[in-house]
Every structure is written in structure tokens, then in C-alpha cells.
């Protein structure tokens, strides 16, 4: 915060609460107010009245950063220097111990058709069923690459994946999942053999995980109930 200096005792404990996305936007249903403006937030108002308020721009004025970048900045890191993507945070949160050379990804369980076109980017916001689906991927092996796949469920439709092996590169363009886009539209960001290999590894993982998930009993049951199957990662 510009112009604000707070001196804390070394022994002082701090509880940092980040209302990630809480500000939201004005809604017609709320008479042009944001959910926070319309809420009965007397406890928050009291805390604010007892403390000091300020304005903090994580990446500069007018820039709305993602959660990961914003939290890095709040904790005192320069995202422009240290940010490498969200996957590493997700892997750490899933208790995956990463090694040098590993690639980490934040993943969604999704619904695709047989040509890998995305139908639902969150598989109907699947919940605890995703735990069993993630377990079914624990023994997944890639036929054409000596690359280990570590996959863990994290929360709801979300998961974390780590690829471990030689000759992998982070220089791969992975677009955020969108409905009616192809799930396998990965592209190398440079002409290196490592980037091209990583693209092919990701495509093989996508197809291999689809082959496991599409016939999983949970997905057969979901389809029978008219729910979107979580048949892809």
C-alpha cells in the first residue's frame, strides 16, 4: 500500500484473510450494487473502522490479476520476476513433492466428445465423485514416452498434475478450457525438440485419461442420470 507503513513485532502473529473475488461487479438484480455492497457486513465494517484502510494494486492500476498473481504480490513477491504459472501452487496444495525438471499443471475434470471437443469445462461442477476418478488415473502409463504422470484431486472438479521425465519444456501454449474448443489444442511456444515433445506427451495423456474415464462406473452412472460425464482432464 502506498503511503502506509506498519511496524510489527517479530513475535506478533498475523491472520491474513484475502477476499478473493469478493468485490464482484454491480448487478441489476441488486439495484446496481455489488454483492458486497448489498450484504449485511457489519462485522467487516467494524473491523475496517478499527483499523487502517488503503488501496493496493497487485499489478498496476486497472489490471485485474488472477488469484495466484495477486496473492504473490500481496505476500511481497514480484510476479513479473517469479511467476511461472499456477500449476506449482496446485501441486504443492495437493502435497505433490516436485523435483527439478518437473512440469506442474492445474487441471479441471471436463466433459468432451470423442474428438476432444469440450462440452462442459467443469463436468457439471462434479464434486466428491472426482476423488474416485482421480484415483483411477494413478496407474496411468504413457506408451510412447518415458514420462511419469502424478495426478491428484484437489477440490470439486479441480486437480493437479505433474509430469516427470527428461526432455520436457514449459514452453507450451495451453489455452484455458472453453466450451466447444478442442481440448488437445496445445502448441509449442518455440521450435525446441523439448517443447514439441511436451505437446505430444500432453496429447497422449489426454487421450489415455479419456480412455480410462469414459467407461468408469461413476461416469456411466452420471450419464444414466443425465449428468455430464467427467471423461477428460
Language model regions located:
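Long, well-ordered, tryptophan-enriched scaffold segments
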Residues: 200, 210, 214-221, 225-228, ...
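Beta-strand elements within well-structured catalytic alpha/beta cores of enzymes
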Residues: 13-25, 46-47, 205, 221-224, ...
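A general structural signal for short secondary-structure junctions and capping/turn motifs
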Residues: 7, 44-48, 99-101, 150-153, ...
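A contiguous, mid-domain pocket- or channel-lining segment that forms the substrate-recognition surface
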Residues: 86-213
